[in-house]
Regions:
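Carbohydrate-recognition beta-sandwich/jelly-roll modules
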Residues: 2-284, 308, 320, 327
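Active-site-proximal substrate-binding groove within the catalytic cores of carbohydrate-active enzymes
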Residues: 195, 199-201, 423-551
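Flexible loop/turn segments at secondary-structure boundaries
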Residues: 211, 257, 292-297, 335-340, ...
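Hydrophobic faces of well-ordered beta-strands that scaffold small-molecule active sites
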Residues: 246-248, 283-287, 328-331, 406-408, ...
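Conserved N-terminal glycine/acidic-rich loop preference
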Residues: 248, 297, 303, 398, ...
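Aromatic- and glycine-enriched glycan-recognition loops and surfaces
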Residues: 250-356, 388-389, 427
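Active-site groove signature of glycoside hydrolases
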Residues: 283-291, 389-419
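Active-site-adjacent "subsite" loops/lids of carbohydrate-active enzymes
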Residues: 313-314, 319, 330, 334-401, ...
Length: 551
């Protein structure tokens, strides 16, 4: 049985687990003796997937086949329809189980391509040098930011994609074995996990030319599905933002010391010094740690830090920045509330609780025992009470200090919240409500994925350090590289800037980070973590020259 269109041909074996061959429109073979696998995971045994390893070819129609997958007990069953379509080979799977389902996955092995390109973690490429018996997993949309991946050859290849506008969590796995790559697509049930049936749909298609061909196809669908507008038109209300090509990031208070990284007076000195090196009107001044005792302390309180000089000095800083021609962006968190905040008892009921009934929040290992201590809670951003509070907090900051832009940290998060409004819908609605309430304030986010692309026109690139062994600290894997797929896909709709944790040029990892930003076309940032760190270095001059060339 052969299923095909102009771009791809898929030859099925009588043994329904096997796909004899997948070849492209030009005859290039990209899979030989590929094995299909289907698995089901249930909440109470999430680490023990049920393997549906028995199949029967139940029905053959014109350009369509139906396969039943079952486990040993025959209690778990997946009905899969595979059919030819204009946009590839469509897979539609319906899974039933004797108890509620958490996650279903489909896998295909023995894929013969040179590399996989994934719009994840800022954009990644995995080459065929990836070690055998290794698998990397990417959750959509937090890590896997757009619902496709590309198996690339010298000219053409195949790609897997889905076209789901709903805010549903998905999973991509890329594995490498002696017989080639393995590709897995997973789909997660929406919380609360009560249903014993779960359905998913995805496509595999071929393409000719380079990797931009499938990206352009997905972008066209994405633009229509999410009603996207190009970034230049979206920035018409903030004309100053169109001129920005550099971020000057000056850190203030720190949690572990009464001595700040910069006082507000020292920040003013930085502004005067920077003016001699780059045009203020092209510089966005970004201020992490301007509030309280440092970044994320007492959130969502954002009173200017007394350690840095207090409210009066902060007003002087912002006024000086404006007088010199700069624009100012403050740092906030889009959903965080510390557990010791006076309002937390009221908001505790709105804390994110995932599908496994675990309360969610940010945590850090403070004592080296590999167990993270709780720091602050994640509040579902779709809750009206949270939106009302954040509008009040941000409104007071904007009115008191004439702030130009607000950075919303952690906008890329995605949870399967069992209690309250859908998390992704809520995040998007929350950002849109903030923008509507403060139409003259630019809102920026951390990272980018399909569900927050429309409301955010500025975003920090996120995750590029993951291509190195331990967050960029121990050297880079040659088989895992940064790739411009994400900036190429999203760059028409959002302006990407460097991440807030970019290192100072004196740090060993800076060279890797800046080279990655240059490859991806990301606006550079000079991040100053101490008032003694120099500005006038050769590396900074190179960053400025790169900034001038960015359109």
């Amino acid at each position: 049985m052969i299923l095909s269109n102009n771009n791809i041909n898929m030859v099925f074996n009588e043994n329904s687990l096997l796909i004899d061959c997948v070849f492209l429109g030009d005859g290039t073979t990209v899979c030989t003796q590929g094995k299909q696998a289907v698995s089901v995971r249930i909440p109470k045994a999430a680490s023990e997937p049920v393997l549906l390893s028995h199949t029967q070819l139940c029905e053959i129609q014109t350009n369509k086949i139906r396969i039943i997958f079952e486990d040993d007990s025959k209690k778990y069953q997946a009905e899969m329809w595979i059919e030819s379509a204009d946009i590839g080979i469509r897979f539609k799977m319906s899974v039933t189980a004797p108890e509620p389902i958490w996650l279903i996955e489909w896998k295909l092995t023995s894929i013969d391509v040179d590399e996989f390109i994934i719009p994840a973690l800022g954009g990644q490429l995995l080459t065929r040098d990836m070690p055998d018996d290794m698998t990397l997993s990417y959750k959509y949309p937090f890590w896997w930011n757009s619902q496709f991946t590309i198996g690339n050859r010298e000219s053409g290849g195949l790609w897997l994609f889905s076209r789901d506008m709903r805010p549903n969590l998905k999973l991509l796995r890329i594995g490498k074995h002696r017989d080639g790559f393995a590709l897995s697509y997973g789909y997660e049930a929406s919380a609360p996990l009560n249903s014993k049936r779960l359905e998913a749909e995805w496509y595999i298609d071929g393409f000719s030319g380079d990797w931009r061909e499938p990206v352009d196809i997905h972008r066209k669908w994405l633009e229509n599905a999410f009603d996207l507008k190009e970034v230049d038109s979206r920035l018409d209300r903030y004309p100053w933002a169109k001129n920005v090509n550099f971020v000057l990031e000056i850190w203030g208070a720190r949690r572990d010391s009464e001595m700040p990284m910069h006082t507000f007076d020292q920040m003013i000195d930085r502004l005067h010094e920077w003016k001699t090196m780059h045009v203020p009107e092209q510089t966005l001044v970004y201020l992490p740690g301007f509030a309280e005792n440092g970044i994320d302390t007492h959130i969502p309180n954002y009173n200017p830090s007394e350690r840095c000089g207090g409210a009066g000095k902060f007003k002087e800083l912002v006024d000086t920045a404006h007088d010199l021609g700069y624009r100012v962006m403050i740092h906030t968190n889009v959903l965080g509330m510390t557990y010791n905040h006076r309002l937390f008892p009221k908001f505790k009921e709105y804390q994110v609780v995932d599908c496994f009934e675990r309360s969610q929040g940010w945590a850090m290992d403070l004592d080296g025992d590999w167990l993270a201590e709780p720091y602050f809670a994640y509040i579902n951003p779709g809750v009206k009470a949270w939106g009302d509070l954040m509008k009040q907090v941000i409104g007071e900051l904007v009115e008191s200090y004439d702030i130009d832009a607000v950075f919303l940290d952690q906008t890329l998060l995605a949870f399967n919240d069992r209690n309250y409004p859908n998390f992704l819908h809520g995040m998007r609605a929350h950002i849109e409500e903030l923008q509507a309430s403060f139409p003259n304030v630019l809102f920026a986010g951390e990272g980018m994925h399909e569900h927050v692309l429309n409301p955010l026109s500025f975003a920090q690139i996120h995750g590029i350090d993951s291509v190195a062994e331990v967050h960029g600290m121990d050297g880079q894997y040659q088989w895992r590289q940064v790739h411009p797929v994400s900036t190429y896909l999203f760059g028409r709709y959002v302006k990407f800037v460097a991440h807030l944790l970019t290192r100072h040029p004196s740090h060993p990892i800076f060279r890797f980070q800046e080279a990655s930003y240059a490859k991806l076309g990301v606006l550079p940032a000079l991040c100053l973590y101490d008032h003694s760190q120099p500005i006038g270095t050769e590396q900074v001059s190179h960053m400025i020259e790169r900034a001038k060339k960015i359109k």
